[in-house]
């Protein structure tokens, strides 16, 4: 059984050991559960401990170094939660990174999207993370259910709940979990962030680099959405920014709107025969039936075009003049 170990020889032979993990940022171990106690040790977030006994809201534990003491049970999570995080990290091991970001505050890493879901690890303010996926979870407004101002059940339900965006992230230690999206500031390069036009950046990628004098300048694919949580799509617009080496500025080489986009977006370099090796990217979009299809694009700077599979037809998209940014 996960989290349960058989002890070795001696008096404890055959006794099942229960393991747990510290979910609090830090907690003290005490020699008694009474109001007056002595500190026997300190455990930190993520530490593994053995449960020796339980008494009301406390558990007596033994650390890996052999220190024993009482700790509040609310500071612990069972082995099953730890195993869940290990499984999640394994499942998302090869998930393509959609963006990088920095935590705005200390924040908990959840096993599933939602404020009330299990959490184990805590990320410190300023932690660097990689964005993998997006999801939404319902946030119930405190006290909303106690206000029967409408007899319309649908209106009452909408007033009582809000949808929040969550990011699935990987930290620098390889831990994977869900955090509130508003707790992470994406590290969007300033030179393209200024052209977001009030929209929210969801993902960004370097397609390639061009030479301008003695420096290399990146060209970007940026995926955006409306500036609010709870939308039914991960993104609904994409833009490609290319660098004009004559005018030394970014220009919008491609823009597409009204997408029902689904992460992940994937970027690669691909051989296109006579055109040579070019940057390519794939967008995943959902139709009205909920079916997801892939759209491939290639960029032969500064032109971006769809790459149609055999038998595939391109939806009609109105041509757009190139936007210039000063």
What does each of the following model-derived ranges do?
Residues 254-326:
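Hydrophilic extracytoplasmic domains
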Residues 18, 25, 39, 45-47, ...:
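Envelope-exposed proteins and targeting segments
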Residues 11-20, 50, 62-101, 144-215, ...:
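Boundary regions of SH3-family modules and the immediately adjacent low-complexity/disordered segments
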Residues 29-32, 97-100, 104, 108-112, ...:
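Core beta-strand residues in small-molecule sensory/regulatory alpha/beta domains
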Residues 31-54, 111-134, 140:
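SH3/SH3-like (including bacterial SH3b) beta-barrel domains
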Residues 218-231, 277-287:
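Short beta-strand elements that form the blades of beta-propeller/WD-repeat-like
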Residues 55, 135, 225-228:
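Residue-level signature of beta-propeller blades and closely related beta-rich strand-turn architectures
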Residues 5-8:
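C-terminal motif of bacterial Sec signal peptides marking the signal peptidase cleavage site
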